Each structure stands twice: as structure tokens, then as C-alpha cells.
């Protein structure tokens, strides 16, 4: 099966890199041509009220779709636009229409994606990651967050997307600080690739296997284009 071959490639790739490595962007709203056939994007969530004028543009996109914008701002540092973009992405993702057994994620440009969860847990993914390749956010997302998200492993993909959007904000702002946002995006990509490879082994009938594989390549490419 094509997706199984992609998963084997993902496993080889994942085990050959360290989370802190620069890994592979496409414009935020444009998938790579080689991935588009397996991907299905949804419209929305819609703009809530009047569009927000803000810098960076990625933050304006997110805020325009949040009815409670201030809730997602970092209250300890209200000037932190990178974190506001990251957290706001989660807020808009909450508004993506729910599909039983799947996870919705907002992708900018008025588009979103819904990906079914494979039959594994975040704990399973955590156990599949060699100790030598467990990065700075491993403890938070693959250990502590299991209290709320263990049975919903595509949550890891949403966190990766949020870090990618934070990277777009950092680059638009021209910040020398906040480089960890990009490091964490690379680290989360690594964990998502491990999850894809694991799903190929433990859930061979996973219905969204090709979609997840294609999405990983799409999101990786748009990140790479932003940081090159």
C-alpha cells in the first residue's frame, strides 16, 4: 500500500534525525502539489465580526476568527504576539466542525483539516521515541498532556501546526528572540512522523493514513519555506 510505504519512509526519516535539527515552507494556504491528491481541506471557521487589522498578518488571520480574542493572549506577557498566534490557533481549531473520532485543525487562509485518530495513544508514541531523541517538549506534550489527550493522538499534529504558525509570526516580526518556537516546531514534526510510522504497524486499516502522511509533508514544506 502506498501509505504503508510512506510510513516506512517516515520511520526511517524520524530515526535518522534529532528533534533540534532544521527540517523542512508552501504558502500557508497552498499544499504541495505532490500531496494535494490525498488531502481534503475544509472551509472555515468563518470570520467573526469585522476583520482584525494586526501585525503580523498571521495573527490577524487567527484573531479575526476568534470571538474571545483576549482569552488566548498570554496574560503574563500581553505583548507576546508569537504566543498569541500559537494559542489563538488552538482557539480557532476548537471552532472547526466536529467529526466523531477525528481532530479538526485550523490552517490559516480560512481553511482547516480534519484527521481521524489512529488506534493508538500518545503514550504509545512516547514509548516509540528513543530516549536519545526526546527533546525539550517531550515531557510536556508526550507525558503530561496525556492526562487530557492520550486517546486523541492527532492532538500532537495540532500542536505542531500551532508552532508552525508561531514561526510565521516570528518571521513576519523579524524577531531575533523566540527561536525556540522554530526548534519546537521541528521537534513536534519528528514526533508526528514517529506517530505515522507507528500507526502503520499497529493500525494497518487506519482510514486516514494517506491523509496524515500527506498532511505531514504539506505542513513540513510550508514550515521549511518560511525558515529558509
Summary of predicted features, one role per range:
Residues 1-2:
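N-terminal hydrophobic targeting signals that begin at the initiator methionine
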Residues 66-84:
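Short pre-active-site segment immediately N-terminal to the catalytic Zn-binding motif
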Residues 94-143:
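Post-HEXXH active-site segment of zinc metalloproteases
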Residues 137-228:
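Long, well-structured alpha-helical subdomains associated
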